[in-house]
Each structure stands twice: as structure tokens, then as C-alpha cells.
């Protein structure tokens, strides 16, 4: 494993518990289609706070779970050390998106402002609800409406009117009282 100096890594999953005695591990993918995690290579593992590159040797489905074999991880003991470690990939491997489509990591940290100019807060995370994605917006400490958090559906053009990644601003048609 080599250390990754560059810190442009996005978490795409997590290693789970060991499987068998030959170093296999379960994985939990946070990509839209679970097996899409294998489209993004190379992988980096966050070990003791540092990203280290690792080579994927093999993967397969086993009882509706995905298990992986990593190069150099050849027994249960070596695999146990990696249990629950985050899997990341360099952002440069992600494809360019069409206008109106955004990666969640681009939206997190953006300031949300409604059409009246009221600053509603900052996007802290995204949620997938099945029908649409939702912005989780942490309200400012002195929010005039007493809100701590707002959940705003990411419906482009309906609710989300403009996203400016240069200024990290999202303009929404949303009542500040909600």
C-alpha cells in the first residue's frame, strides 16, 4: 500500500467484516448501483487517518452481498485489520456530468439562499429518499425562524433554481419557515 499525498478523495464505500480464511472482506458500496464501485479505480483505504492505495484482486457476489479480495491481504488476520475501513477514490476518476446534475460532494458545504435573499444555512449532507435527493441544511445559529436544520428536496428547476459551484451557492424557491 502506498500513501496518497493528494487529498482529493471521495468516499465511495466501506469494507465490512471478514469472509472466510483467505482474506476476503464484505463491502458496503455507497454508489447508486452497488457494483458501480468497481468502475472507479484505483481504490484508497483510510488507515489511521491517511489514504493508502490498494489494488483490488477480485470481487464477487455471495448471498446477496459483495465480497472482495485485496492484493496482499491473504488471510483472515490481515483482513480483520481492514474491517470497517472507508474506501475512497480520487475525484478525477468521476465522469463529467450534464448540466443540472451534481455530485453530492460538490453540494456539501454550499450556502443555501432562498429567492427572497434569506440565507437558510449550509448543506451538511445529502439524503436519498427514493423519489428524490434531499439537501440537509444546517441553519445559521441565529436563524430568524428558530430552525436548526432544514430538509429541502433537490428538485432541479422546481425547488432548486440555481447552483453556482464557483461561489458555493444554491438558490432555492423554498419558504424559510419550513
UniProtKB/Swiss-Prot annotation:
Alphabetized GO MF terms: ribosome binding
GO CC entries: cytosol; ribosome
Alphabetical list of Gene3D superfamilies matching this protein: PRC-barrel domain, RimM
Pfam families according to UniProt: PRC_RimM, RimM
Broad class of the protein's primary localization: cytoplasm
Biological process annotations from GO: maturation of SSU-rRNA
Domain notes for this protein: The PRC barrel domain binds ribosomal protein uS19.
Family: Belongs to the RimM family.
Function: An accessory protein needed during the final step in the assembly of 30S ribosomal subunit, possibly for assembly of the head region. Essential for efficient processing of 16S rRNA. May be needed both before and after RbfA during the maturation of 16S rRNA. It has affinity for free ribosomal 30S subunits but not for 70S ribosomes.
Name the record gives this protein: Ribosome maturation factor RimM
Organism: Haemophilus influenzae (strain ATCC 51907 / DSM 11121 / KW20 / Rd)
Gene: rimM
Amino acid at each position: 500500500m502506498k500513501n496518497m499525498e493528494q487529498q482529493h478523495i471521495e468516499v465511495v464505500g466501506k469494507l465490512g467484516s471478514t469472509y472466510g480464511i483467505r482474506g476476503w472482506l464484505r463491502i458496503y458500496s455507497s454508489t447508486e448501483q452497488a457494483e458501480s464501485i468497481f468502475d472507479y479505480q484505483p481504490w484508497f483505504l483510510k488507515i489511521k487517518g491517511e489514504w493508502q492505495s490498494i489494488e483490488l484482486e477480485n470481487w464477487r457476489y455471495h448471498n446477496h452481498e459483495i465480497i472482495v479480495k485485496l492484493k496482499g491481504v491473504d488471510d483472515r488476520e490481515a483482513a480483520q485489520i481492514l474491517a470497517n475501513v472507508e474506501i475512497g477514490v480520487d475525484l478525477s476518476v468521476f465522469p463529467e456530468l450534464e448540466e443540472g446534475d451534481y455530485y453530492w460532494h460538490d453540494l456539501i458545504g454550499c450556502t443555501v439562499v432562498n429567492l427572497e435573499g434569506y440565507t437558510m444555512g449550509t448543506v451538511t449532507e445529502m439524503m436519498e429518499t427514493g423519489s428524490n435527493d434531499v439537501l440537509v441544511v444546517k441553519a445559521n445559529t441565529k436563524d430568524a425562524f428558530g430552525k436548526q436544520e432544514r430538509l429541502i428536496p433537490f428538485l432541479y428547476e422546481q425547488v432548486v433554481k440555481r447552483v453556482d459551484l464557483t461561489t458555493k451557492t444554491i438558490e432555492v424557491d423554498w419558504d424559510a419557515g419550513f
